[in-house]
């Protein structure tokens, strides 16, 4: 059985794309990432796992700005604390047996099949409420870049996300 993931190359001139791999074939992930991989589990926008080159920083792989923005948007504790170097591959969270699953359909659609995006923030004292504005973006990474820049300038921002407009 195959599972689907979203490949995010470090080279921003290259598009992100869906890649299907056989479930449980970790050598397929190694081939995509280019070596031994590490996994970062994220909870937002939906529980997922980002597979990265485990030695990307040590061997001097290039910064993956798009994957880093997704990581930072998943939880503000990552902001300016870490970056992803080299290619990244997003799959679903592990199942009850610890096996990797395919990327959740809503996350795949958000990255690849959404025509227009808006950004939202949670601010100090807003509880679970999200607030946005009228800005719209055609690219998810343009939206992420904008909202993360906003969070840098506006210190009341505690969390960020992008959603379909």
Language model: regions and residue ranges:
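Surface-exposed beta-loop interaction hotspot
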Residues: 98-117
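A short, charged, amphipathic alpha-helix used as a generic interaction element across diverse proteins
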Residues: 29-36, 136-161
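Short, extreme N-terminal segment that most often corresponds to the first beta-strand
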Residues: 1-16
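Ordered, amphipathic secondary-structure segments that act as subunit-interaction surfaces
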Residues: 75-102
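Short glycine-rich, low-complexity/disordered patches
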Residues: 38-47, 81-89, 118-125, 153-165
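Short aromatic-glycine-(Arg/Gly/Cys) micro-motifs in beta-strand/loop hairpins
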Residues: 111-132
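Short, structured protein-protein interaction patches enriched in aromatics and acidic/basic residues
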Residues: 44-73
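Amphipathic alpha-helical packing elements
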Residues: 15-45
């Amino acid at each position: 059985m195959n599972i689907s993931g979203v490949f995010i190359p470090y080279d921003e001139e290259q598009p992100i794309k869906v890649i299907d791999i056989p479930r449980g074939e970790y050598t397929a992930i190694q081939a995509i990432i280019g070596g031994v991989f590490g996994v970062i589990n994220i909870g937002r926008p939906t529980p997922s796992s980002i597979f990265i080159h485990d030695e990307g920083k040590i061997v001097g792989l290039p910064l993956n700005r798009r994957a880093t923005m997704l990581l930072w948007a998943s939880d503000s504790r990552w902001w300016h604390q870490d970056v992803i170097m080299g290619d990244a591959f997003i799959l679903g969270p592990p199942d009850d047996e610890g096996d990797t699953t395919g990327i959740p359909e809503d996350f795949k659609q958000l990255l690849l099949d959404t025509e227009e995006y808006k950004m939202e923030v949670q601010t100090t004292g807003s509880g679970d409420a999200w607030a946005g504005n009228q800005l719209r973006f055609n690219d998810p990474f343009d939206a992420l870049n904008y909202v993360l820049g906003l969070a840098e300038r506006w210190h009341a921002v505690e969390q960020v996300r992008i959603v379909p407009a």
